[in-house]
């Protein structure tokens, strides 16, 4: 009940983006019934993005939690049965939208794992696909390097705009971004400054031109090449924004290790740290 208009709109945008993601067949939306983010508003937002199957469950109207759960499960099972009848089709890489992320970083992230992701990104772009570079707070100190790669003056200016907005927001509450970034874990792993961390972070974007800057969770068009999404440095929130924007898969580098995933999109974990690869084998997919 505490959401105001911009927060509420963002919530609806993300839910609509999740429903529209290519990995999703259909959506069951569950609500309490008296929140600000009303069911009819959410349904409208979803229907503006996609015509996929959509069902609604309102707990207060269903007769309580247990009845609402039964109803939602029944709807979900119906959709699973329908989805199982679909036939897989091959699509070109140009239809692929890949999100890139880093978390639990250490020096091996910038030296090995992120450059590997950058090479992948360049290959996706060369094949006509789309790669999303995220985490605006981790461009700070390296934003001028990204801006030099902007495809247009508008993109150049937007890169500086999103970075400066984060810095200004922190100053408004008397904080400095460098007081919380790098994190204690980053420092324990060997990263010394925010600029060092940012230089490693932007390696995930390879060497391709930056063609666009998207707001958080907004629909990313296919065949866009390298683009930026204005996301926070918080890993689950950043990944959620890219998936809401249409990313079908996320490639995630980590030096110290992290289990962060996503319910809709596969999250492939890459590390450049052999100790982390050996220690967290159930969380890490690739040793870079």
Locations of regions flagged by a protein language model:
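Metallocofactor- and cofactor-centric catalytic cores in central/energy metabolism, strongly enriched
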Residues: 1-288
């Amino acid at each position: 009940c505490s959401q105001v208009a911009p927060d509420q709109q963002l919530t609806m945008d993300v839910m609509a983006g999740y429903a529209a993601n290519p990995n999703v067949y259909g959506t069951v939306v569950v609500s309490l019934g008296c929140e600000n983010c009303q069911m009819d508003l959410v349904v409208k937002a979803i229907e503006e993005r996609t015509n996929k199957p959509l069902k609604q469950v309102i707990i207060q109207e269903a007769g309580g939690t247990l009845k609402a759960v039964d109803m939602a499960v029944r709807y979900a099972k119906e959709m699973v049965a329908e989805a199982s009848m679909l036939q897989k089709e091959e699509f070109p890489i140009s239809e692929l939208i890949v999100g890139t992320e880093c978390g639990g970083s250490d020096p091996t992230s910038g030296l090995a794992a992120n450059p590997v992701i950058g090479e992948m990104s360049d290959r996706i772009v060369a094949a006509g696909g789309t790669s999303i570079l995220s985490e605006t707070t981790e461009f700070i100190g390296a934003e001028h390097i990204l801006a030099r790669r902007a495809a247009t003056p508008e993109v150049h200016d937007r890169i500086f705009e999103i970075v400066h907005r984060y810095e200004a927001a922190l100053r408004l509450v008397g904080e400095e971004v460098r007081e919380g970034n790098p994190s204690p874990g980053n420092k324990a792993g060997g990263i010394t400054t925010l600029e060092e961390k940012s230089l490693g972070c932007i390696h995930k974007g390879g060497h391709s031109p930056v063609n666009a800057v998207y707001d958080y969770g907004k629909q990313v068009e296919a065949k866009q090449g390298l683009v930026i999404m204005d996301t926070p440095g918080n890993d689950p929130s950043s990944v959620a924004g890219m998936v809401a924007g249409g990313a079908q898969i996320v490639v995630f580098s980590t030096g110290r290790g992290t289990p962060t995933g996503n319910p809709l999109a596969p999250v492939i974990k890459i590390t450049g740290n052999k100790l982390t690869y050996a220690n967290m084998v159930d969380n890490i997919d690739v040793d870079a």
